[in-house]
Amino acid sequence: MSQQTSTQVRKLVIGIVLLAAILMIVYVPFQSFKMVNPILGYQLERIEQFKVEENPSWPLLTLTTWLVSFFYPFWGTMSVLAGIALLAIAKALYDGKVWARGLSLFCLAIPSMGGAYMIVPWMNFVGSKEGGFPPAVLIMTVGLIPYFAVLLAEKGDLKQKVVDFLVFLMLGVTAAENFANGHAAFRILYGHPKRPIFAEGIAITYFGWLGL
């Protein structure tokens, strides 16, 4: 936001940001931890099922349990730090400081990305068994609503705002998917049973050493 933005709009946006910051501190980390055990329970169940069925892909699931148990709390803790940062820069954001706008968008992107990542393991393991609404959607929403409130609060052309919304939305989707794909690539490359021998079919490139 800039000083050209009306006082009423700035107060509204700051209110949304402060509410999000509080939720990032008191809600997001605990909800992130709460999702871990249900996912791990069904992951371990599927691993045992694959072993009984002699499914050769079971080793690729073994690292998934460790990755989920690390990255869910990791994103929760990062959200806490981002929430504290938002509280610290709220006055500067209200005053229209350019650096505060960029930093606030960065902080709000953390629960947005983390929540988007958390949706997939939940749906694959818990949702496929129990159904229901993924709690990670709420985590993602905590970041997304204030993110776009800050981004679109400036006075400007409606068409430009639509473009900004779509571009930044796709940037967020790309960032979250890149993290999720890196998560999957890691467990596949490091989980194959013949490691450190390169698994059959893995392309040898300049970065092939990353698969060892």
Question: Whereabouts are the PLM-identified features?
Answer:
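Topology signature of small-to-medium multi-pass alpha-helical membrane proteins
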Residues: 2-212
